[in-house]
Amino acid sequence: MSHNTFGHLFRVTTWGESHGPALGCVVDGCPPGLRFKLEDLQVWLDKRKPGQSRFVTQRREDDLVKVLSGVMLDADGETMTSTGTPISMLIENTDQRSKDYGEIARQYRPGHADYTYDLKYGIRDYRGGGRSSARETAARVAAGGIARLVVPGVTVRGALVQIGKHKIDRRNWDWDQVDQNPFFSPDAAIVPVWEEYLDGIRKAGSSIGAVIEVIAEGVPAGLGAPIYSKLDQDIASLLMSINAVKGVEIGNGFAAAETSGEDNADAMRMGNDGTPIFLSNNAGGILGGISTGQPVVARFAVKPTSSILTERQSIDADGKNVDVRTKGRHDPCVGIRAVPIGEAMVACAIADHYLRDRGQTGRLK
């Protein structure tokens, strides 16, 4: 299986499977001289790790990241400085229960990658889905922690804005609320609604989809290039690479199709300091594939988890009709833990374009 690497100058390769002994990543192209501590990476993995509420999988993983290369340790024994060589990171798997998947070893779960993996490669890791499992994304979050260090002054934050048909009230948006509830919701009022709704989904052994919004602030103007190297193109590509993602939009996205040209175009005025001021941000901070200096806004839709307790019609590897019912521990709404994953992907895209711009134009330091 090829294509386990993304990025141009800031390149990330992930490896490992859901039920293997460990998984991890190699970050190549990280500039030398970046100083950080392990806790600067661990904080993002802690947001993503399973078992933190009844609304996510009860698989218990500490997701403790280890940095194996690419850094030098300071005298304090904690602070690391990047050397410019590949940064390799490892996360051990400690709570696999492969026996839960014995009954579906030759069955294809509807909506899952089981069938297509077997079709393409003639073999698949049925234990938790192998590489197709969202477990793989822990390594991406670790890489995103490094990416956040690359671009000075950039803040990347995400939030869950919709579960099923239940959407947040954007008038209640408060970033301080995001880490105060199990859903990463910026709207405190929607939390009890989601709790009741997901409790019903969970008890029925079913699952539901969600929408996540990621906003990057402090992005320098001028990142990205026309046509085949657009910043929004690469953000969309990386978000689409996340397991279970079925749609991505930048700025107003699909809503722009219902908007007039007068309302959609972001009007501009010159500020007192000589810096242009945008009067709105329908473009999501990107015009012509190049960042405007406004916040970069992306949303992505995550489908319902395919592994559910409800019995469904399918086939097996022998071509027989079967009824599939998945046991094991699964997310009733995988979109919850997709919030830090989406943040990581946007951070990696911005870091890559920052380094590419610096190398091509020399205008950024």
Curated annotation (Swiss-Prot):
Subunit structure: Homotetramer.
GO biological process, one term: aromatic amino acid family biosynthetic process
Cofactor detail note: Reduced FMN (FMNH(2)).
Catalytic activity line of the entry: 5-O-(1-carboxyvinyl)-3-phosphoshikimate = chorismate + phosphate
PANTHER family for this protein: CHORISMATE SYNTHASE
Binding site for NADP(+): R48, R54
Organism (species): Rhizobium etli (strain ATCC 51251 / DSM 11541 / JCM 21823 / NBRC 15573 / CFN 42)
Function: This reaction introduces a second double bond into the aromatic ring system.
Keyword Amino-acid biosynthesis appears in the UniProt entry: yes
Recorded metabolic or biological pathway in which this protein acts: Metabolic intermediate biosynthesis; chorismate biosynthesis; chorismate from D-erythrose 4-phosphate and phosphoenolpyruvate: step 7/7
Annotated InterPro entries: Chorismate_synth (IPR000453), Chorismate_synth_AroC_sf (IPR035904), Chorismate_synthase_CS (IPR020541)
Family stated for the protein in its record: Belongs to the chorismate synthase family.
Gene encoding the protein: aroC
Alphabetical list of NCBIfam families matching this protein: aroC, PRK05382.1
UniProt keyword list: Amino-acid biosynthesis, Aromatic amino acid biosynthesis, FAD, Flavoprotein, FMN, Lyase, NADP
Protein name per the record: Chorismate synthase
Cofactor list: FMNH2
Gene Ontology CC, one term: cytosol
PROSITE patterns referenced in this protein's UniProt entry, alphabetically: CHORISMATE_SYNTHASE_1, CHORISMATE_SYNTHASE_3
UniProt keyword 4Fe-4S present: no
Residues where FMN binds: R131, S132, S133, N243, A244, G288, K303, P304, T305, S306, S307, R329
Pfam families the record matches: Chorismate_synt (PF01264)
EC number: 4.2.3.5
Gene Ontology molecular function terms on file: chorismate synthase activity; FMN binding
